[in-house]
Amino acid sequence: MATQICTPTFSAGSAKGLCGTSGSFSRISSIHSMGSCRAPSLVGTVGSVSSFRTGFSGPGSCLPGSYLSSGCHSSGFAGSGGWFCEGAFNGNEKATMQILNDRLANYLEKVRQLEQENTQLECRIREWYECQIPYICPDYQSYFKTAEELQQKILLTKSENARLILQIDNAKLAADDFRTKYETELSLRQLVEADINGLRRILDELTLCKADLEAQVESLKEELLCLKRNHEEEVNALRSQLGDRLNVEVDAAPPVDLNKILDDMRCQYETLVENNRRDVEAWFNTQTEELNQQVVSSSEQLQCCQTEIIELRRTVNSLEIELQAQQSMRNSLESTLAETEARYSSQLGQMQCLITNVESQLAEIRCDLERQNHEYQVLLDVKARLESEIATYRRLLDGEDCKLPAHPCSTECKPAVRVPYIPSTTCTPAGPCTPAGPCTPAPQVSTQIRTITEEIRDGRVISSREHVVPRAM
């Protein structure tokens, strides 16, 4: 009696059998060879323990689903596992049923757990999308307008301050001009007073000279009178002496009139004094006029020089004030430019940091989305495989029983169970075995990956895009 040995090997997400099966599920068709019959076997994957319930349709009937033959043993399904079915049919149906029921319960529990995890992940993704409110750049237009108004006010205030400073400087210059004029007039007054004092001293000296001359004239007059008296006395004395002695008549020259001579001398002296006085007065007048002319010319020149100096000082002060105003305006403009550059550079740095942060957040979100999409794809793949496996088990449980002959070595076997078939799965016997029928393809299970992209702004959905990707199992 020849038997077919089929040893499927499990891996994460796929199953391969040594009989040539590959894909997510492995099916072995019913084989009738040398009077022995073996029912098809279906094995699940994805790290979960798969089990299903089988039943007997009666004595001599073929077991639907999967059964354990003699010498068949199972290994753990933590990530990988396999069935090694060798030998004949095992008669311990109750133990087999118990094991299969336990495996089915574990499988259903694992399915429910995965569904709960899928629901939790969907809730977390939804909450994360709700929490991730798109960053709205604040509107700085009002602040820019306020800043421009403040800058205009600052410029107007600076210009007003410059105008007030210019007026103050002009007032200071006018005060300096008046002070200079006052000092000039004061110096002129002092000079005139000094000249007057000098002229008064000269007048006093001339008065003293006049008094001296008058005193001299008086003394000369007194001396002349004394001389006249003495002369008369001498003449009288001589006459008296001559009268007593001799009367001598002498024919002499006429006598000299002394009064006339004195009058002539007096006239000469008076004319001389008058001439001297006129000369001195003329000289004094000429000297005074020359001095006054020199003083006037000097004062005029001094006044001209002082006015020129004042004008030059005023011009210099106005130019200095204008220079200071221009320098202050330049400094204010430079400070304003520096402040503007610093403000815009800081705003640019903040925006650059914000852009960098947003880009990093977008990169993180993209990585999270890719990771979650990958996990979601893996979960969808697992879910689809589990659903297909559940559907397969359900069809196996709800299908018709396969009637087997009473004798295990009968030459015919009519399987009553149709198992889904993966197109890439082939049945290759390990020994001489004649299959009961050709391998018919089972219906394919197709899945769709639906990606919904929503753009949310201020808590409102602006746009929504849906992308459906068909995926065949």
UniProtKB/Swiss-Prot annotation:
Residues 257-400 are annotated as: Coil 2. Keywords: Coiled coil, Intermediate filament, Keratin. Residues 1-93 are annotated as: Head. It comes from the Eukaryota. This is Keratin, type I cuticular Ha6. The record marks A342 as: Stutter. PANTHER family: INTERMEDIATE FILAMENT, KERATIN, TYPE I CUTICULAR HA6. Residues 94-128 are annotated as: Coil 1A. Residues 241-256 are annotated as: Linker 12. Residues 93-404 form the IF rod domain. It holds the Pfam family Filament. Residues 129-139 are annotated as: Linker 1. InterPro entries: IF_conserved (IPR018039), IF_rod_dom (IPR039008), Keratin_I (IPR002957).
